[in-house]
UniProtKB/Swiss-Prot annotation:
Chief location bin: secreted
An example Gene Ontology CC term for this record: extracellular region
Organism whose genome encodes this protein: Homo sapiens (Human)
Entry protein name: Interferon alpha-14
Function: Produced by macrophages, IFN-alpha have antiviral activities. Interferon stimulates the production of two enzymes: a protein kinase and an oligoadenylate synthetase.
Disulfide bonds: C24-C122, C52-C162
Known glycosylation sites: N95
Keyword rRNA-binding set for record: no
């Protein structure tokens, strides 16, 4: 999908803002961005989830990757970044743009993009801080496979409104897990 010029400019400004800021700060501001993302996802609902019960599917969310206790901070942040990146990719497809209100979708893109930039700055800083920044490739691969299952499901369901509703609810659930991981990381600081 070709992003509108105004949205592209907003993303460039956000990119410059987070690139120029110093340090990793998974602050209350970042938590507020997460809540706004979840609120936007809730507002994007177009049909009742109850009308789509027959389409429910277990996408096998890799919850163990979001437990956060076994990770170094850089590893956990890398997993969070991958989650945001894959969510952005999923919702920026041509089939996705047809399923959602364009204004809400653009706001959603901006929130996700800001979070990705914030997390990227944190990864860069944390890799320099930790002695052995072993990036947990298995965890990142688990997140990618999770999104591959979601994409395959949408294709099998021919991107139906109910399939998108099931996916929207699933992404809200996964974003809630990522929000909880971020809270645990902030408490460690």
């Amino acid at each position: 999908m070709a992003l509108p010029f105004a949205l592209m400019m907003a993303l460039v400004v956000l990119s410059c803002k987070s690139s120029c800021s110093l340090g990793c700060n998974l602050s209350q501001t970042h938590s507020l961005n997460n809540r706004r993302t979840l609120m936007l996802m809730a507002q994007m609902r177009r049909i009742s989830p109850f009308s789509c019960l027959k389409d429910r599917h277990d996408f096998e969310f890799p919850q163990e990757e979001f437990d956060g206790n076994q990770f170094q901070k850089a590893q956990a942040i890398s997993v969070l970044h991958e989650m945001m990146q894959q969510t952005f990719n999923l919702f920026s497809t041509k089939n996705s743009s047809a399923a959602w209100d364009e204004t809400l979708l653009e706001k959603f893109y901006i929130e996700l993009f800001q979070q990705m930039n914030d997390l990227e700055a944190c990864v860069i800083q944390e890799v320099g801080v930790e002695e052995t920044p072993l990036m947990n490739e298995d965890s990142i691969l688990a997140v990618k496979k999770y999104f591959q299952r979601i994409t395959l499901y949408l294709m099998e369901k021919k991107y139906s409104p109910c399939a998108w509703e099931v996916v929207r609810a699933e992404i809200m659930r996964s974003l809630s897990f990522s929000t909880n991981l971020q809270k645990r990381l902030r408490r460690k600081d």
